[in-house]
Amino acid sequence: MRYRRVQYGLVAAILPRQRRKIMYQDDYRRIDEMMRKKGVFTNLETGKQYYTGYEYATLYDWDQYFEAIVQLYLGWQSDYARLGVEIFLDTQKENGHIQRSSDGSEYQLLEHVKPFLSQICLLIYNRDGQVDFLSDKDFYYFNRLKRYLDYWLLRPENYYGLAFWDSSLHTGMDNQRDRAGHWSACYCCGVDLNCYLVRECRALALLARILKHDKDAEIYDAHAERLAQTILEKMWSPEDGFFYDIDRRTGEQIKVRYIGAFATMWADVATKEMAKSMVENYLLNPREFNRGFIYPVLSASMPNYIEAPLPEDWGCSWRANTWIPTNYYVFEALRKYGYVDEATHLANETYRQVKRIGDREYYATETQTGCGLDPFWGWSLLAYFMPYENESGYDPTKILVEKNDKILLT
């Protein structure tokens, strides 16, 4: 059954524009104060300062991309974002591998950093107009960026060039074991991962052109196009009208529907018809993703769609739970493909729910309550900027060179 597009009312328009601006400024001042007080730490090995939303001071890979967007909106200098990238690149091994967090368990440190470092550098360039730190010392950090991305792209175990996660913990969606397995499982070619890689290759290609490394730009543009084509050929299910991960051991699709499939839209990989099926048959379907606190990270039709953790779970819960960074990139994806009303509803509803419940690490979808760290000053704070992006049309996640002078805290 196809679920029709709904004409959502503009929730934000209920309040007069000037009153909304005052309300948003109050939000921005409050979270800016909290972030400055709680989120800045110093790396003991390098002495470099960085930002993290975690009270135990760990710097995580994809978190810092979304956290950097918040910092820039609040008018912060790009230093913490830059130094966070450097901290990761400083740990690089000869083969290009970088641990995915600044500290953690033995297994965690064996897993490669998620592909967001070049995208963070592009955020920095669009704010500052330069990325000199990449070219300093004979392009020391730029060369490390290339090696880290090549580690993902050129592993001989990849399936038709599709990269794979080491475990469910590695995906960042900690307990989605149904699709990615336990520690060192190493079989899940994630739709999410390979779409992040498409974006990361395009971002590194842009940085290469900025640094006048045109040959490198051609190489990573070609990687992006090859990956995008393989995602379309191998991961799309014509029968279901949905993208699925691949088990690299068998070549079979892993029939778990999760929010990361919509990264195909965020990365401009899905065709218009594919996006139409995914949005209208799944995202808007109450039996799939259109639940209480939109949108859960796992479809409600999946067997393990529950809020409580299961035995053998590690980390946080990514099942019947709503996480703001995935809401955020689904919001950007909807706008890209012309789902304006749905994007508006998602932006306003995410803001409303976070404002009501509070700044939490994540949320229980069905009971609409907060979970995890309380308070949390990490990527969940993106919720406060989604109404602005919706009203202004601005998208800081676009992979292009575009001056970012959007400082919202006045």
Question: Residues of each region from the PLM?
Answer:
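Aromatic-rich carbohydrate-recognition surfaces in CAZymes
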Residues: 57-64, 68-167, 191-194, 254, ...
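Structural helix-adjacent loops and short alpha-helical linkers that scaffold large soluble proteins
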Residues: 23-26, 72-85, 124-146, 206-225, ...
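Alpha-helical scaffold segments in carbohydrate-active enzymes
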Residues: 30, 34, 87-90, 144-158, ...
